[in-house]
Amino acid sequence: MKQVFNPYLPAGEYIPDGEPHVFGNRVYVYGSHDRFNAAIFCVNDYVCYSAPVDDLSAWRYEGVIYKKKQDPLNKLGIRLLFAPDVVQGVDGRYYLYYAYDFLGRMGVAVSDKPQGPYA
């Protein structure tokens, strides 16, 4: 039996519900961020990976794009942020939308670049 693995994330990196988007000449992947062996999911800050659209074997870690404690309702960092997605607005800026825990609320952060950082 062959081992199944993620083709672009390093071992130990867990980004479920990934959302790929093409902005310019790169593919960006956004998603929830799980921690290895954590009792719950979506506990890490958001990160981003990207690759050139013409070489999807050359993935690059863009870094932390949004820290969960940045959310005004999550200053202690105890709430889960999950299912993020990014869109480019008509103003050219990038908007990161995410679900705020299981409270029926959405959050939004803004950046001038698709790889963040978002505020």
Where are these regions (language model features)?
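Carbohydrate-active catalytic/glycan-binding domains of CAZyme proteins
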Residues: 1-119
